[in-house]
């Protein structure tokens, strides 16, 4: 008689995409099992199927899924969730007409958060970040990428990474860090941005690489991200930083084309970046280059939504070109203070014209591939981590259909219940 550590039973409907990456029309592929059971051993799935198929299994612990809809735990591949302070005052200024670039030029925007983060200790960063991770987890995210990038000096960037590392060891959510020392040009280098590029290349990257070598939590390369945009880093500056990062063993990621198409997408593909993120202003010829690569296009629909913009990334064009599309929240204090992947899906269905099936796969299977965690998380299959979100919804279409509420009832990480949302407890 087969035996497991845990059996997750009474799943009303289990839905998962194939394993990553999913290109083009593959993004709409889902497998559904009604009245499903999942068997878990040492945190990984060892069997899944219908209740009839797994009726012989026993376990040390049985988890009643309450008849809920089961999906893979969301994987959020792009956040800036570690920071101090907030930018609620800028939200009101934007409503009154201030632009993103105007706020940046006046010392606000990213610089406002840099000032607050530089003044915070590691303990304060941990304390302020933890509730954001609680919210991400409560909304069904079981793995999240978190960037540094609000230090813009070597010491604070390392403090941010240390805070992220502490959270990775003390919070149930899975965390994948990214170094983003090239997030913006700090005020002290405004008149000499090349000197800041020198600092990133000659001091920050080697220091962070040395720090990473001492870590025991993660076994894969650290990623280096950069904001390739007017007012931040040019294509030439980005290339210089990324070439050095690649030589030091970093994986590469880029913020590109949020406002203008500088050429960051072709650069990313040329250098073998794992993802390019934003893509709001990406022209068709660059979408074609991206689609013909292993680089994931990560759409952040909460960001133009948060900025009150009407232009969103051309996600359908990337799908139709047979590219790899993922979704993320871009959780950050300024433009997308969103901690909900279901909300990102709801926006994507409306403004990016994704079907609910496409959006679900983009937020699980392909988002795991965007941070190269796809061999462990993002889909439900034998050998994968038992990371599930149980939703109080009749089927997967309702994830994009409903918005403004949290449909997640129970969150399971490596076979353990790590969150029960009280709102759904009396169902």
Curated annotation (Swiss-Prot):
The Enzyme Commission number assigned here is 3.5.2.7
Q: Where does N-formimidoyl-L-glutamate bind?
A: 150, 332, 334
State its location(s).
Answer: Cytoplasm
Tell me its cofactors.
Zn(2+); Fe(3+)
Q: Per the annotation, which location comes first and is thus the protein's main one?
A: cytoplasm
Residues reported to bind 4-imidazolone-5-propanoate: 87, 150, 183, 258, 335
Catalysed reaction(s)? Answer: 4-imidazolone-5-propanoate + H2O = N-formimidoyl-L-glutamate
- Which GO terms of the cellular component aspect does the record hold? cytoplasm
Q: Give the metabolic or biological pathway.
A: Amino-acid degradation; L-histidine degradation into L-glutamate; N-formimidoyl-L-glutamate from L-histidine: step 3/3
Write out the GO MF terms: imidazolonepropionase activity; iron ion binding; zinc ion binding
- State where Fe(3+) binds: 78, 80, 255, 330
Keywords (A to Z) from UniProt: Cytoplasm, Histidine metabolism, Hydrolase, Iron, Metal-binding, Zinc
Under InterPro entries, the record lists: Amidohydro-rel, HutI, Metal-dep_hydrolase_composite, Metal_Hydrolase
Per the UniProt entry, the signal peptide is none
Binding positions for Zn(2+)? 78, 80, 255, 330
A Gene Ontology biological process annotation? L-histidine catabolic process to glutamate and formate
Cofactor note as given: Binds 1 zinc or iron ion per subunit.
Task of the protein: Catalyzes the hydrolytic cleavage of the carbon-nitrogen bond in imidazolone-5-propanoate to yield N-formimidoyl-L-glutamate. It is the third step in the universal histidine degradation pathway.
**Family under the similarity heading:** Belongs to the metallo-dependent hydrolases superfamily. HutI family.
What is this protein called in UniProt? Imidazolonepropionase
Gene name, per UniProt, is: hutI
């Amino acid at each position: 008689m087969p035996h497991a550590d845990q059996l997750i039973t009474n799943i009303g409907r289990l839905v998962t995409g194939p394993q990553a990456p999913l290109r083009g029309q593959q993004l709409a592929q889902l497998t559904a099992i009604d009245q499903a059971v999942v068997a878990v051993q040492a945190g990984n799935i060892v069997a899944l199927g219908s209740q009839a198929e797994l009726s012989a299994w026993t376990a040390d612990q049985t988890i009643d899924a309450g008849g809920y809809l089961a999906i893979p735990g969301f994987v959020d591949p792009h956040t800036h969730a570690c920071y101090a302070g907030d930018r609620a005052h800028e939200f009101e200024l934007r409503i009154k007409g201030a632009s993103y670039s105007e706020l940046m030029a006046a010392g606000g925007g990213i610089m406002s958060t840099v000032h607050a983060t530089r003044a915070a200790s590691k303990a304060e960063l941990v304390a302020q970040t933890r509730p954001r991770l609680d919210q991400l987890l409560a909304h069904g995210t079981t793995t999240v990428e978190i960037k540094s990038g609000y230090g813009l000096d070597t010491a604070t960037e390392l403090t941010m990474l240390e805070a992220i590392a502490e959270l990775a060891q003390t919070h149930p959510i899975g965390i994948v860090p990214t170094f983003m020392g090239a997030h913006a040009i700090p005020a002290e280098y405004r008149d000499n941005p090349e000197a800041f590029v020198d600092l990133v290349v000659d001091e920050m990257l080697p220091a962070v690489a040395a720090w990473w070598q001492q870590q025991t939590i993660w076994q894969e390369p650290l990623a280096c991200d950069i904001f390739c945009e007017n007012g931040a880093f040019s294509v030439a500056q980005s290339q210089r930083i990324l070439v050095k990062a690649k030589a030091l063993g970093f994986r590469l990621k880029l913020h590109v084309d949020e406002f203008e198409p500088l050429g960051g997408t072709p650069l990313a593909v040329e250098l073998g970046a794992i993802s390019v993120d934003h893509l709001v202003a990406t022209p068709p010829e660059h979408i074609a280059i991206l689609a013909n690569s292993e680089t994931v296009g990560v759409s952040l629909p909460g960001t133009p939504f948060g900025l009150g913009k009407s232009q969103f990334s051309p996600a359908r064009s990337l799908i139709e070109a047979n590219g790899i599309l993922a979704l993320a929240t871009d959780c950050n204090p300024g433009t997308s203070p969103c901690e909900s992947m279901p909300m990102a899906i709801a926006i994507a269905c409306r403004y990016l014209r994704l079907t609910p099936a496409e959006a679900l796969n983009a937020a699980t299977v392909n988002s795991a591939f965007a941070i190269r965690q796809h061999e462990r998380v993002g889909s439900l299959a034998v050998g994968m981590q038992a990371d599930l979100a149980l939703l109080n919804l009749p089927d997967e279409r309702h994830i994009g259909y409903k918005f403004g509420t949290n449909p997640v009832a129970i969150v399971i990480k490596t076979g353990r219940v790590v969150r029960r949302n009280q709102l759904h407890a009396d169902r």
